[in-house]
Amino acid sequence: MFYNSSKILFTTIMIIGTLITVTSNSWLGAWMGLEINLLSFIPLLSDNNNLMSTEASLKYFLTQALASTVLLFSSILLMLANNLNNEINESFTSMIIMSALLLKSGAAPFHFWFPNMMEGLTWMNALMLMTWQKIAPLMLISYLNIKNLLLISVILSVIIGAIGGLNQTSLRKLMAFSSINHLGWMLSSLMISESIWLIYFIFYSFLSFVLTFMFNIFKLFHLNQLFSWFVNSKILKFSLFMNFLSLGGLPPFLGFLPKWLVIQQLTMCNQYFLLTLMMMSTLITLFFYLRICYSAFMLNYFENNWIMEMNMNSNNTNLYLIMTFFSIFGLFLISLFFFML
């Protein structure tokens, strides 16, 4: 993917756009960075010559353009409010800005475009959408102090992200609803501390990369492919099982560490109701991860094995297994490191 010169150019511009947004000291500058990011990400989405990727890029453009328009309008209103002695309600304007940023990040209740769009993307584009494209909106959300709307979005995101993945047969939609659920956890960490949000985002990005990397190299897009996937290779199926559990946040895997930090901070802030909802939603996500892995282990369609033939000694497979090792034993290694300090 990244060996194409045009893709390198657009990826670089996309990164620059995000950095402009993050380092900007005005809403107008942040809007400009978001637009640069948007206009460079669309060519990356629509590069493949198939109908679904073109449709996905159009959906992304329309939703992001709507959010950008609302953000620009609200930014102008804020500038007018500062010049007109606060005759315009600043809290209402900030709420509109928050809604636009939640739409950009794909958080509930503005999530409806996200799973459908994910279905038309390649795995590497889906990974960028789930990780890098969330940095700028979440950083801008951290500048706003509107707890009530953020709390509603957190509750809806964790519930919809958990329940929405229950009846999915597409792995891309499954990862999309998982991303919405994790986004709820990230938004809740934004209410507490920016450093905890960054830690959560880094760990989530790594775990998402491990899974999408595997799905990409083995060309897996639907659940029924997992049933016929390497019947004779129990190691790869076991690694898939462990990575799903780590992404779900089950101890003692690496994915539990960021959730542990969020749980600890929410407990200190006496947010017991929110914490209970978030933990219940995590149990639901772990349930459908376990159901997928149980089916992949127990249901084998031997007549379809020829579809998934690949070189088991490839460098990609070895890299995936190395990353899986850190996904499984990362929490132990980090604990050992701090213990030795």
From Swiss-Prot:
Catalytically driven reaction(s): a ubiquinone + NADH + 5 H(+)(in) = a ubiquinol + NAD(+) + 4 H(+)(out)
Record keyword Lipoprotein present: no
EC identifiers of the protein: 7.1.1.2
PANTHER family the UniProt entry points to: NADH-UBIQUINONE OXIDOREDUCTASE CHAIN 2 (PTHR46552:SF1)
Keywords from the UniProt entry: Electron transport, Membrane, Mitochondrion, Mitochondrion inner membrane, NAD, Respiratory chain, Translocase, Transmembrane, Transmembrane helix, Transport, Ubiquinone
One GO CC term, this protein: mitochondrial inner membrane
The family this protein is said to belong to: Belongs to the complex I subunit 2 family.
Protein name, UniProt field: NADH-ubiquinone oxidoreductase chain 2
GO MF entry, a single one: NADH dehydrogenase (ubiquinone) activity
Compartments where found: Mitochondrion inner membrane
A Gene Ontology biological process term: mitochondrial electron transport, NADH to ubiquinone
Biological role stated in the UniProt entry: Core subunit of the mitochondrial membrane respiratory chain NADH dehydrogenase (Complex I) that is believed to belong to the minimal assembly required for catalysis. Complex I functions in the transfer of electrons from NADH to the respiratory chain. The immediate electron acceptor for the enzyme is believed to be ubiquinone.
Keyword flag Acetylation: no
Topology in membrane: Multi-pass membrane protein
Transmembrane domains' residue ranges: 8-28, 61-81, 95-115, 121-141, 146-166, 174-194, 195-215, 238-258, 273-293, 321-341
Organism: Drosophila yakuba
